[in-house]
Amino acid sequence: MSIDKSYCGFIAIVGRPNVGKSTLLNKLLGQKISITSRKAQTTRHRIVGIHTEGAYQAIYVDTPGLHMEEKRAINRLMNKAASSSIGDVELVIFVVEGTRWTPDDEMVLNKLRDGKAPVILAVNKVDNVQEKADLLPHLQFLASQMNFLDIVPISAETGLNVDTIAAIVRKHLPEATHHFPEDYITDRSQRFMASEIIREKLMRFLGAELPYSVTVEIERFVSNERGGYDINGLILVEREGQKKMVIGNKGAKIKTIGIEARKDMQEMFEAPVHLELWVKVKSGWADDERALRSLGYVDDL
């Protein structure tokens, strides 16, 4: 009697902030797990997205963008989390943006050169490159930087060539038993996903300055007798002025954030959600490593 083989492995998605790593992860999984926003530094935790297709299970680690500035404690922890997830994977997808190449890209590349895992280079946002004639020389320049397993021009936004990436990933998964049941999409708890959804809405509806000094704690997440969930979210900001900004004129801003977050939660949890949000000032949290650890920003996952 033959036993069917199964394949399973970890894949890190790395790159400087804002190149489209989370969008790529969401496309590879076919649904939204990692929060996406046009602001850099959106992903703060190493989200694991799981894609199981028949015998193949790919487990994706979505790293925060590696970046040069290490000034604040939160940035230091984010960089550590990104570096540590490069270490213990079967494959790395290095995402870069169109024909742009920055010192941050260079820094990520240097970390990858030291690693043992093969690297797929995903050149994202190629559909946005104005001068198509610049693309080929740039791809040749990239190819000379290190011995990549493959170089794939993609658009994570439209899905262009994302299936090519998925096929390369499948080909390089080692023979192993699956770590997760086949219907799992992420190993993060619903409570964690709820906080991520609220954070995404904060980033979407607030000005450029605010989001990095904002975090969300879920104080209550319980099932109710109506077959849904009662969720209380606490939004922590660093200053009184930011609190006013989050609440908005006569509470209009926080109301919008709550409505939009509730919609996404209901879709994700497939159940009715009663959501209440509060805003509280907790000064200096982004600079205090102890406070960060208590909020779940851990660097030794």
Swiss-Prot record:
Which InterPro entries does the record match to this protein? G_ERA_dom, GTP-bd, GTPase_Era-like, KH_dom-like_a/b, KH_dom_type_2, KH_sf_prok-type, P-loop_NTPase, Small_GTP-bd
The listed locations are: Cytoplasm; Cell inner membrane
The way this protein sits in the membrane is described as: Peripheral membrane protein
Keyword vocabulary terms for this entry: Cell inner membrane, Cell membrane, Cytoplasm, GTP-binding, Membrane, Nucleotide-binding, Ribosome biogenesis, RNA-binding, rRNA-binding
Gene Ontology CC terms: cytosol; plasma membrane
- The Era-type G domain sits at 7-175
For this UniProt entry, what is the primary localization, expressed as one broad class?
cytoplasm
- Where is the segment annotated G2? 41-45
This protein's assembly is summarised as:
Monomer.
State the similarity comment: Belongs to the TRAFAC class TrmE-Era-EngA-EngB-Septin-like GTPase superfamily. Era GTPase family.
In UniProt terms, what function does this protein have?
An essential GTPase that binds both GDP and GTP, with rapid nucleotide exchange. Plays a role in 16S rRNA processing and 30S ribosomal subunit biogenesis and possibly also in cell cycle regulation and energy metabolism.
Q: Give the protein's recorded name.
A: GTPase Era
What lineage does the source organism belong to?
Bacteria, Pseudomonadati, Pseudomonadota, Gammaproteobacteria, Enterobacterales
